[in-house]
Structures are given as C-alpha cells and as structure tokens.
C-alpha cells in the first residue's frame, strides 16, 4: 500500500509568538485545503513559559521568576497547563478531523497521533508505552488537576517511560482541523520550572516538587549516552513516519507564508490582550 505524503517543517528556534502563530497558520491553511497534513518540529528563542488557553495566570504564574530567568511568555491556543520550553524538541501535528485514520474522539485521536512519538522514543532505545487510567480514582484525578505544572500528572494516553511522563501534549480542534502540539524533554531544570508557579506555601511547593521527581523525567536522565537535539530530530521524524505510516517531505515556507505568520504573531500572540486576558 502506498504511503500518504505529509509535509515536514523544521522551523528551528523562533520567538514564542512566531511559534504559536505558525501552528495556527498551518491549521488555517490546512482547513482551506491549501496544504496537506503537516508534522512540524521547532525550538524556542528565548526559552519560554507557555500557558494553556484557559489558564488563570494571575493566580498561578510567578512573573518575577519569569523575568528573572529572561523567559519568553505566551498563551497557547490549546488547553492544558504551564510548560517550560527550554531543553526540548517541540512538535506539532496538523491534520483534518475527516482524515480516514483519525478517530472522532479527542483521546483516541491523541493516541493515534502520539504513536509517532512512541516510535520516536523506541528509536532512541527507550521502552515507551501509553499510560491509561485504570481506576475510577485515577480517572477523577485527571478531571481535577492539582497542579499548574503540565508534566505533573500523566493524562489519558500519556507517554510514559519506566512509569514517568516523557512527553506532554495538548490538542485543539478548529475549522475541522486537529492541532496537537507538545514537548519532548531532553533535559529539565526542575528548580527553574517550579520557580515559575505560585504556591499556597513553601511546604506545598516542596511536596509537589518531590512528587514530581517520581512522575516526570527527561530523555537524558534515562540514557547513558546523551541524546543531542539532532539525534532526537532524526529519531522522532522517523518515528512519525513509522507510527503514522506516512512519508514526510521537507517543506520551506514561502515569503508570502512567512509574512502571514509574522503578521499573526505581532497582532495576536505578541499582544497583552491575548497573553494576559485571564
């Protein structure tokens, strides 16, 4: 059977506003049938704290720490909680809800898309699998997250290696198109991450950070020989091709497309109105 060809865009390191604008632009172009489905890899310059679309930043985010670490800040178009984008490979997948391989429900579509990430971890020699909540108590805990920190609890079909979460993802559906994006951690500075949030007390912070160590992990904590960003890109690009049974064709944005993205970045994702609205 012939493999379907999707576009592959590696946009390198870019500003937080540009990164979110390009994801939205790809969703829009795909909804207009101007482009096929897309897998995109990217990084962040500067390192950035992103928050979920619905997140209340006044109650949850420590902006003194965000400024102290010279971090970028952006609100995502997707839900979920706070993510520090630093030593990671970030990916996005843009595909129509009508695609024959895409299930109708969010969780099942997440599982299908994340098969590419699962294969990527396996390409690096890691034994990755999907965590599925087994008990009613586990299911309830997913509905009521205790923490502002995205990696603090495995969610439905979360990717896990040796019982600890290795890739956090979020999904939105607009204009009949699925946008899923997420973080693949190579390394993680836990103290910096936990500085970025507000807590009822120092004791609560200490307890959460202690629990976090048992739940979340970066690739280079699990592998003896350190994985470079280039090695990660290769492993996960091949992982998506295997996991989704597709062929990825590299694509460079045209100047016209770049102009569209820059305009969207400036007018929406770099604006206080968007970022500080909650």
UniProtKB/Swiss-Prot annotation:
<dbReference type="GO" id="GO:0036211">
    <property type="term" value="P:protein modification process"/>
</dbReference>
<dbReference type="InterPro" id="IPR050664">
    <property type="entry name" value="Octanoyltrans_LipM/LipL"/>
</dbReference>
<dbReference type="InterPro" id="IPR004143">
    <property type="entry name" value="BPL_LPL_catalytic"/>
</dbReference>
<dbReference type="InterPro" id="IPR045864">
    <property type="entry name" value="aa-tRNA-synth_II/BPL/LPL"/>
</dbReference>
<comment type="pathway">
    <text>Protein modification; protein lipoylation via endogenous pathway; protein N(6)-(lipoyl)lysine from octanoyl-[acyl-carrier-protein].</text>
</comment>
<protein>
    <recommendedName>
        <fullName>Octanoyltransferase LipM</fullName>
        <ecNumber>2.3.1.181</ecNumber>
    </recommendedName>
</protein>
<dbReference type="GO" id="GO:0033819">
    <property type="term" value="F:lipoyl(octanoyl) transferase activity"/>
</dbReference>
<feature type="active site" description="Acyl-thioester intermediate">
    <location>
        <position position="150"/>
    </location>
</feature>
<dbReference type="GO" id="GO:0009107">
    <property type="term" value="P:lipoate biosynthetic process"/>
</dbReference>
<keyword id="KW-0808">Transferase</keyword>
<comment type="function">
    <text>Catalyzes the transfer of endogenously produced octanoic acid from octanoyl-acyl-carrier-protein onto the lipoyl domain of GcvH, an intermediate carrier during protein lipoylation. Is also able to catalyze the reverse reaction. Octanoyl-CoA can also act as a substrate although very poorly. Does not display lipoate protein ligase activity, despite its sequence similarity to LplA.</text>
</comment>
<dbReference type="InterPro" id="IPR024898">
    <property type="entry name" value="LipM"/>
</dbReference>
<dbReference type="Pfam" id="PF21948">
    <property type="entry name" value="LplA-B_cat"/>
</dbReference>
<dbReference type="GO" id="GO:0009249">
    <property type="term" value="P:protein lipoylation"/>
</dbReference>
<feature type="site" description="Lowers pKa of active site Cys">
    <location>
        <position position="165"/>
    </location>
</feature>
<keyword id="KW-0012">Acyltransferase</keyword>
<feature type="domain" description="BPL/LPL catalytic">
    <location>
        <begin position="33"/>
        <end position="248"/>
    </location>
</feature>
<comment type="similarity">
    <text>Belongs to the octanoyltransferase LipM family.</text>
</comment>
<comment type="subunit">
    <text>Monomer.</text>
</comment>
């Amino acid at each position: 059977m012939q493999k379907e060809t999707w576009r592959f865009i590696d946009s390198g390191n870019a500003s937080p506003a540009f990164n979110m604008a390009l994801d939205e632009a790809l969703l829009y172009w795909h909804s207009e049938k101007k482009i096929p489905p897309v897998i995109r890899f990217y990084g962040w310059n500067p390192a950035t704290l992103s928050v979920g679309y619905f997140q209340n930043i006044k109650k949850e985010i420590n902006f003194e720490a965000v400024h102290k670490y010279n971090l970028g800040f952006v609100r995502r178009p997707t839900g979920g909680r706070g993510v520090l984008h630093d030593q990671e490979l970030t990916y996005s997948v843009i595909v129509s809800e009508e695609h024959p391989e895409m299930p109708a429900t969010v969780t099942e579509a997440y599982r299908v898309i994340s098969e590419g990430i699962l294969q990527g971890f396996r390409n690096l020699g890691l034994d990755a699998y999907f965590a599925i909540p087994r008990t009613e108590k586990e299911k309830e805990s997913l509905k009521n997250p205790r923490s502002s920190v995205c990696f603090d609890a495995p969610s439905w079909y979360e990717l896990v290696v040796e019982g600890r979460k290795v890739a956090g993802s979020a999904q939105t559906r607009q204009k009949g198109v699925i946008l899923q994006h997420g973080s693949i951690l190579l390394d993680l500075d836990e103290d910096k991450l936990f500085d970025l949030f507000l807590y009822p007390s120092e004791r609560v912070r200490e307890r959460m950070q202690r629990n976090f160590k048992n739940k979340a992990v970066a690739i280079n904590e699990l592998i003896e020989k350190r994985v470079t960003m280039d090695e990660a890109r290769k492993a996960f690009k091949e992982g998506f091709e295997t996991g989704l049974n597709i062929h990825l064709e590299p694509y460079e944005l045209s100047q016209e497309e770049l102009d569209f993205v820059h305009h969207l970045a400036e007018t929406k994702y770099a604006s206080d109105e968007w970022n500080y609205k909650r």
